[in-house]
From Swiss-Prot:
MF terms (GO), sorted A to Z: histone H2AK119 ubiquitin ligase activity; zinc ion binding
Disruption phenotype: Combined disruption of both Pcgf3 and Pcgf5 causes embryonic lethality; there are no live progeny. Male embryos are detected at 9.5 and 10.5 dpc, but are smaller than normal. Female embryos are already extensively degraded at 9.5 dpc. Placentas from male embryos have some parietal trophoblast giant cells, but fail to form a labyrinth. Placentas from female embryos lack trophoblasts altogether and fail to form a labyrinth. Defects can be attributed to the observed lack of monoubiquitination of histone H2A 'Lys-119' and lack of Xist-mediated silencing of one copy of the X chromosome.
Subunit comment: Component of a PRC1-like complex that contains PCGF5, RNF2 and UBE2D3. Interacts with RNF2; the interaction is direct. Interacts with CBX6, CBX7 and CBX8. Interacts with AUTS2; the interaction is direct. Identified in a complex that contains AUTS2, PCGF5, CSNK2B and RNF2.
UniProt miscellaneous comment: Selective knockout in hematopoietic stem cells has only minor effects on gene expression and hematopoiesis, probably due to functional compensation by Pcgf1.
Domain of life (superkingdom): Eukaryota
Protein name: Polycomb group RING finger protein 5
PROSITE patterns linked to this entry: ZF_RING_1, ZF_RING_2
Zn finger spans (RING-type): 18-57
Pfam entry (one): zf-C3HC4_2
Gene Ontology terms describing biological process: positive regulation of transcription by RNA polymerase II; random inactivation of X chromosome
UniProt tissue specificity: Detected in hematopoietic stem cells and multipotent progenitor cells.
Assigned keywords, A-Z: Metal-binding, Nucleus, Repressor, Transcription, Transcription regulation, Zinc, Zinc-finger
Predominant location: nucleus
Amino acid sequence: MATQRKHLVKDFNPYITCYICKGYLIKPTTVTECLHTFCKTCIVQHFEDSNDCPRCGNQVHETNPLEMLRLDNTLEEIIFKLVPGLREQELQRELEFWKKNKPQENGQDDISKVDKSKADEEGDENQDDKDYHRSDPQIAICLDCLRNNGQSGDNVVKGLMKKFIRCSTRVTVGTIKKFLSLKLKLPSSYELDVLCNGEIMGKDHTMEFIYMTRWRLRGENLCCLNCSASQVCSQDGTLYQSYPMVLQYRPRIDFG
């Protein structure tokens, strides 16, 4: 009977180590464009100076590469099971970090589990943009319900009471869908299609991308003006003022 070969942890190192810091992947985060994975902290810091993947050199996103990152919780669990003591070491490092950085707010040197979770939430909030992207170029949007005579019963989607909104050009279709689900009080399992000019938009499409590539305005509706609160900024810095961009929504249609 052939003996089974035992694999050492180092045999898996090419798959569980970070290309940037050369250590084990902590909070593994994958770039959706090329599927390369890095530590969350490493790749976020890298994207502060570059829009390219540090491993293959491909451009991840023209303006905001952070939109193309996804946490890989499954890989994280695999790494913790492969490397003895790594989970405990990481939890200890995180605890020590909050002890050093949050003593004044907690009023004590020792952070309990409850205090630690609060500190984690506060840390996440501090990393968010304080002005909620209000300093970004803004775009006016009309969210119009696409009426369909085929809708019936629970499949009917109503129109919004206030269908005009103003948001950052970096907002994605996925965020718009969440906004609609919240406003229309739809169940979490309910899925919507968002369309522009009759074409279904992908969840990662930004409002800027849709405006520049799908929202086909006629010449008389588009004029270059001086800077004002209602203007939209294009990628080359040109400012435009126009009628709101119209996005339509409807219950998702399964073509399969």
